[in-house]
């Protein structure tokens, strides 16, 4: 896993070059938005349980067959596994957000996840819907500027949404 800073330095080093002005500007921008980034991650972390629970409720309301006998989330053990998996995805999205880079999400969470779900008979499309529901809740929290530094957060919100989109696509 590399954060945005380590990644830029590694790329420049591999080419035997100094950091370009464009790279320095991008890193400078990331530093300037650091408090906003921390606020977004803090909001997600502080509301993680509600994000997961409410997203699962919404998923099961749309797809009640999942919690009926024979469904993939039927029995408390399977339901707990579903909620655990949703929480893990949310946690790794928050790691990617703080790092400003998706590699931790890809390397430690998403790689091989589709194959695992296929082997277990878990419907990837349902997992994808659950991830999208967590995205909606997290983006709403990120867009709530109450108690956060003022300024445009649209780039951070778009970045956050992209990590959820990446996760949703990886399981189908």
Curated annotation (Swiss-Prot):
Q: Which domain of life is it from?
A: Eukaryota
Q: What Gene Ontology terms describe where this protein resides (cellular component)?
A: chloroplast thylakoid membrane; phycobilisome
Q: Where does (2R,3E)-phycocyanobilin 1 bind?
A: 82
A Pfam short name: Phycobilisome
Q: Where are the N4-methylasparagine residues found in this chain?
A: 72
Q: What post-translational modification does the entry describe?
A: Contains two covalently linked bilin chromophores.
- Write down the membrane topology: Peripheral membrane protein
Residues given in the record as (2R,3E)-phycocyanobilin 2 binding sites: 153
Some GO term, biological process aspect, for this entry: which one?
Answer: photosynthesis
Please provide the record's keywords in A-Z order.
Antenna complex, Bile pigment, Chloroplast, Chromophore, Electron transport, Membrane, Methylation, Photosynthesis, Phycobilisome, Plastid, Thylakoid, Transport
Subcellular location as annotated? Plastid, Chloroplast thylakoid membrane
* InterPro entries according to UniProt: Globin-like_sf, Phycobilisome_asu/bsu, Phycobilisome_asu/bsu_sf, Phycocyanin_b
Function as written in the Swiss-Prot or TrEMBL entry: Light-harvesting photosynthetic bile pigment-protein from the phycobiliprotein complex (phycobilisome, PBS). Phycocyanin is the major phycobiliprotein in the PBS rod.
Q: To which protein family does this belong?
A: Belongs to the phycobiliprotein family.
Its quaternary organisation is: Heterodimer of an alpha and a beta subunit, which further assembles into trimers and the trimers into hexamers. The basic functional unit of phycobiliproteins is a ring-shaped hexamer formed from two back-to-back trimers contacting via the alpha chain subunits. The trimers are composed of alpha/beta subunit heterodimers arranged around a three-fold axis of symmetry. The phycoerythrins also contain a gamma subunit which is located in the center of the hexamer.
> What protein name applies here?
C-phycocyanin beta chain
């Amino acid at each position: 896993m590399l954060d945005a800073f380590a990644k830029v330095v590694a790329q420049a080093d591999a080419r035997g070059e100094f950091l370009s002005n464009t790279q320095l500007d991008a890193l400078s921008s990331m530093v300037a938005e650091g408090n906003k980034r921390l606020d977004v991650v803090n909001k997600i972390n502080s509301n993680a349980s509600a994000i997961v629970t409410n997203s699962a409720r919404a998923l099961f309301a749309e797809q009640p067959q999942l919690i009926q006998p024979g469904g993939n989330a039927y029995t408390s053990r399977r339901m707990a596994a579903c909620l655990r998996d949703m929480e893990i995805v949310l946690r790794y999205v928050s790691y990617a957000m703080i790092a400003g880079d998706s590699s931790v999400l890809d390397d430690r969470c998403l790689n091989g996840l589709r194959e695992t779900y296929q082997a277990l008979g878990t419907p990837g499309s349902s997992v994808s819907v659950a991830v999208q529901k967590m995205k909606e809740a997290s983006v709403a929290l990120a867009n709530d500027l109450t108690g956060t530094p003022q300024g445009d957060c649209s780039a951070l919100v778009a970045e956050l949404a992209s990590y959820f989109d990446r996760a949703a696509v990886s399981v189908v």
